[in-house]
């Protein structure tokens, strides 16, 4: 998946023919687009896979940008158009806040676009020659190494650019990342950015080993890198633990920049003024840098570099999907600046994906969690862009028709973005008359229910048997366990299939997700399941036997022996009643999941339109599932971040009897469905809490508060948590990492407070932080004549992005002003992304803002 590039041809073609004028319709489309984009981001960054091509992803993002531009009130800080990478929401690894935000890169797709980018850079840079550093764009996993006084403190994934996952132990296991930097005079704090990858030459050997021991194989080296690094040691048998460590030890890293870096505190001999000199400094510290970078005086030389490596891209030790071009002069980095998601002084040239021919053997239809029936191309195995491909999505019957492919055709296949397999079309000249047309089935292939559009005019066909369709139940069980929901380790695709579609016993342990928390060891141990492909649902075949691949995921298997001696060629045996470690881990993690946050429970219920943002808003305002269930449409819609569409979806969901059964059985099994200590729906505001009628914006890192914690503290005190600063804002609580909201507050004369004052404010009210000789009420209230449109937008103004996430914040006191009427209480949708910024200041480092995706 490429990062969004608004000037790409794919994005331009994707501008919708019409933009909904009706705000309600626009809101529905925006919500659907955000859900779709976040789902594919989660697939790419979280599950290390994706079902969408670069062009399709860019088209979705561009349509969302157009709608937000046409309807500014729909834009929010957590929109995919304002954020970087994937969401850092997991309980598998501890969260780590980066000292400086890890940005992404904009893309160019042709030599002409590269020349246009360079021309703009040179215009903006003014007089003087611009030199360009060019390097290979590694297709791996972005990593941030934090060194303090030369000692590695943490290693974290990028996450959402602000908060990543702590993978320090696994990075140290690699054995190639120095725990202590070489030399002397190291700064008190420096962040080193790089990419972790799996060597291409060792990839086939890895997958062969995975097959030998019954583990899943990886689709490509990038997935191998992410899948190896992002795993924990707990709960693994000694054999699996050694296998995990062996995979990690094969990983390699190359560094390509610096994040937070207090330049003034460096020794004089470490001073650098160019990106290329940064690489010399990093190499001197003992960090691995790429040897494939060059500095050029002219963009035409960069173009030659791009062509040369494009022709020899398969000869490098790691996969590449383009060339990164950076302005070499660090002084120009600061002058050119950055947008909210990418630096202006760097770009990524994306190579056109590799194309090959293969045979289209069949088109099969898969049914997903929401009942959507999706045709998939099943092809003769072929290698493309470094990995073997057997299948690719065809999206719907209209796409099949538009591509003009017939079963039996020779088709052109490419890796979109060098990651996603995509069928381009048939090689008509090779047809011999044996080909046949694909006919979309009229019945669900899983439960034989007639397929139909969800509503008139829909292209997609869906299975309406939501309760009992095995594929939909399997998908919902997987969703319950996903990182964005209850984050249950051990409940992946194989376990979900085992619980819902077992070969043995005849009756599945789960008919719906209602019984998930009632599972016992007796339910798990007898299960035998046929392994299915995660996307198509097709049965996987054992390449050695030619038969369907069967596993017993929840009971132990006897090692293959002949005459009492281990023999890998002998058949594996089963011990009928001995639970496996996987069974123990699953039951243990299901028990832990019962006490997850209420918002995660809401997401896990698969209620249409209810994602993490809306779920947080509902949980924060109502405090319990019962309160949400009994609320009226007006009460639901009044919650900021919810609105009429989500309110209707909630009411519709609770109207269904088997939905209510899920809630009732989960509760009976011990699932906690309320926020501990919550005073009830809007109780703090209704009771005239200490912040009743006041709007508070939190930005930067506030000591003692997480991002959600600051929001909840404001709401619990009866206040409104704003996402942007306007004349209706009463206080701005600013900590390290605060961005443009701080400047806007100063310009508007809004009172700025620090973390200590914020704590007093939410606990005791405005009187506790009143200025000397000031009227506390006047101190808290902004002037009349506020701009309602600005406040209603609930989003940063255009041009507000690009703030320095590691700048030192010095709270200032502003003049006192008078108050407007009390504002509505806000929700999690209003949370400022800045609130998750750094706990510790540091000046922006050379080359550190750009992070290859």
Swiss-Prot record:
- Name a Pfam family for this protein: HHH_2
Q: Name one GO biological process term.
A: DNA replication
Q: Which CDD domains match?
A: BRCT_DNA_ligase_like, LIGANc
Q: Boundaries of each BRCT domain copy?
A: 686-775
**What's in the GO CC field?**
cytosol
Signal peptide span: none
Q: Which controlled-vocabulary keywords does the entry list?
A: DNA damage, DNA repair, DNA replication, Ligase, Magnesium, Manganese, Metal-binding, NAD, Zinc
Residue ranges with Low complexity bias: 1-22, 772-800, 820-840
- The EC number on file is 6.5.1.2
What InterPro entries does the record point to?
Answer: BRCT_dom, BRCT_dom_sf, DisA/LigA_HHH, DNA_ligase, DNA_ligase_AS, DNAligase_adenylation, DNAligase_N, NA-bd_OB-fold
Concerning Gene3D superfamilies, the annotation shows:
5' to 3' exonuclease, C-terminal subdomain (1.10.150.20), 6.20.10.30, BRCT domain (3.40.50.10190), DNA ligase/mRNA capping enzyme (3.30.470.30), Helix hairpin bin (1.10.287.610), Nucleic acid-binding proteins (2.40.50.140)
Where does this protein hold Zn(2+)? 444, 447, 463, 469
What cofactor(s) does the depicted protein rely on? Mg(2+); Mn(2+)
| Active-site feature positions | 137
In this chain, the stretch annotated as Disordered covers: 1-24, 772-853
Molecular function (GO) terms for this protein are:
DNA ligase (NAD+) activity; metal ion binding
What is the enzyme's main class? Answer: ligase
* Annotated catalysed reactions: NAD(+) + (deoxyribonucleotide)n-3'-hydroxyl + 5'-phospho-(deoxyribonucleotide)m = (deoxyribonucleotide)n+m + AMP + beta-nicotinamide D-nucleotide
Which residues make up the binding site for NAD(+)? 54-58, 104-105, 135, 158, 195, 326, 350
The record's family statement is: Belongs to the NAD-dependent DNA ligase family. LigA subfamily.
Role: DNA ligase that catalyzes the formation of phosphodiester linkages between 5'-phosphoryl and 3'-hydroxyl groups in double-stranded DNA using NAD as a coenzyme and as the energy source for the reaction. It is essential for DNA replication and repair of damaged DNA.
The record, for NCBIfam families, names: dnlj (TIGR00575), PRK07956.1 (NF005932)
For this entry, the protein name equals: DNA ligase
Q: Which organism is it from?
A: Clavibacter michiganensis subsp. michiganensis (strain NCPPB 382)
């Amino acid at each position: 998946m490429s990062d969004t590039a608004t000037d790409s041809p794919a994005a331009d073609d994707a501008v919708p023919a019409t933009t909904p004028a009706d705000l309600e319709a626009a809101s529905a489309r925006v919500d659907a687009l955000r859900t779709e984009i976040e789902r594919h981001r989660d697939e790419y960054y979280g599950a290390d896979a994706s079902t969408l091509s670069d062009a399709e992803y860019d088209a979705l993002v561009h349509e969302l940008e157009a709608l937000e531009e046409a309807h500014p009130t729909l834009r929010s800080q957590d929109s995919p158009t304002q954020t970087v990478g994937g969401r850092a929401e997991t309980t598998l690894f501890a969260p780590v806040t980066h000292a400086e935000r890890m940005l992404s890169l904009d893309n160019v797709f042709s030599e002409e676009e590269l020349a246009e980018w360079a021309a703009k850079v040179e215009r903006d840079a003014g007089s003087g020659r611009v030199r360009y550093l060019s390097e290979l764009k590694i297709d791996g996993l972005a990593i941030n190494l934090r060194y303090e006084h030369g000692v590695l403190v943490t290693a974290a994934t990028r996450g959402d650019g602000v908060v990543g996952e702590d993978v320090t132990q696994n990075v140290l296991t690699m054995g190639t990342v120095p725990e202590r930097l070489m030399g002397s005079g190291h700064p008190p704090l420096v962040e080193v950015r790089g990419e972790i990858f799996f060597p291409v030459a060792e990839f086939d050997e890895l997958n062969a080993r995975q097959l030998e021991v019954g583990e899943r194989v990886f689709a490509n080296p990038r997935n191998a890198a992410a899948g190896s690094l992002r795993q924990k040691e707990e709960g693994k048998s000694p054999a699996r633990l050694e296998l995990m460590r062996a995979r990690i030890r094969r990983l390699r890293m190359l560094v390509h920049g610096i994040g937070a870096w207090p330049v003034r505190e460096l020794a004089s001999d470490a001073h650098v003024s160019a990106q290329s000199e940064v690489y010399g400094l990093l190499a001197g510290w003992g960090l691995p840098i790429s040897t494939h970078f060059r500095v050029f005086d002219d963009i035409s030389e960069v173009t030659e570099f791009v062509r040369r490596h494009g022709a020899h891209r398969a000869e490098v030790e790691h996969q590449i999907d383009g060339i990164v071009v950076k302005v070499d002069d660090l002084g120009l980095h600061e002058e050119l600046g950055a947008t909210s998601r990418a630096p202006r002084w760097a770009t990524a040239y994306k190579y056109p994906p590799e194309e090959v021919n293969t045979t289209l053997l069949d088109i099969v239809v898969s049914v997903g969690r929401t009942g959507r029936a999706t045709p998939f191309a099943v092809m003769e195995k072929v290698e493309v862009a470094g990995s073997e491909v057997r299948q690719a999505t065809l999206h719907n019957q209209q796409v099949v028709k538009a591509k003009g492919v017939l079963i039996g055709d020779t088709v052109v296949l490419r890796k979109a973005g060098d990651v996603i397999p995509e069928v381009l079309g048939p090689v008509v000249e090779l047809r011999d008359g044996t080909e046949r047309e694909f006919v979309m089935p009229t019945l669900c292939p899983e439960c034989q229910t007639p397929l139909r559009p969800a509503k008139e005019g829909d292209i997609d066909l869906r299975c309406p048997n939501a309760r009992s369709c095995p594929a939909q139940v399997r998908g919902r069980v997987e969703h319950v366990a996903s990182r964005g929901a209850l984050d249950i380790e051990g409940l992946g695709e194989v376990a979900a299939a085992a619980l819902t579609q077992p070969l043995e016993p005849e009756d599945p342990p789960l008919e719906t997700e209602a019984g998930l928390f009632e599972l016992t060891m007796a339910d798990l141990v007898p299960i035998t399941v046929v392994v299915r492909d995660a996307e198509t649902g097709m049965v996987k075949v054992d390449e050695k036997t030619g038969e369907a691949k069967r596993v017993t995921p929840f009971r132990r298997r006897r090692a293959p022996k002949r005459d009492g001696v281990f023999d890998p060629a002998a058949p594996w045996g089963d011990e009928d009643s001995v639970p496996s470690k996987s069974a123990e881990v699953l039951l243990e993690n299901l028990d832990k999941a019962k006490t997850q946050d209420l918002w995660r429970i809401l997401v896990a219920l698969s209620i249409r339109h209810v994602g993490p943002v809306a779920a947080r808003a509902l949980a924060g305002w109502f405090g319990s599932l019962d309160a949400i269930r009994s609320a009226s449409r007006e009460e639901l819609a009044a919650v900021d971040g919810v609105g009429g569409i989500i309110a209707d979806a909630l009411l519709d969901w609770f109207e269904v009897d088997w939905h209510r059964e899920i809630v009732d059985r989960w509760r009976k099994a011990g699932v906690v469905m309320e926020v501990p200590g919550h005073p009830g729906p809007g109780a703090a505001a209704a009771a005239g809490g200490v912040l009743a009628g006041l709007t508070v914006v939190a930005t930067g890192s506030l000591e003692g508060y997480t991002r959600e914690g600051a929001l909840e503290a404001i709401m619990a005190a009866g206040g409104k948590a704003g996402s942007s600063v306007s004349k209706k804002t009463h206080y701005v609580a600013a900590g390290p990492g605060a961005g443009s909201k701080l400047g806007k507050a100063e310009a508007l004369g809004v009172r700025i407070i620090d973390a200590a004052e914020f704590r007093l404010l939410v606990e005791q009210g405005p009187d506790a932080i009143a200025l000397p000789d000031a009227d506390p009420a006047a101190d808290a209230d902004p002037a009349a004549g506020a701009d309602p449109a600005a406040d209603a937008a609930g989003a940063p103004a255009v041009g507000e992005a690009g703030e320095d996430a590691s700048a030192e914040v010095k709270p200032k006191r502003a003049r006192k002003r008078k108050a407007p009427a009390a504002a509505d209480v806000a929700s999690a949708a209003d949370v400022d992304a800045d609130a998750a910024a750094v706990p510790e200041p540091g000046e922006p480092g050379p080359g550190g803002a750009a992070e290859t995706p």
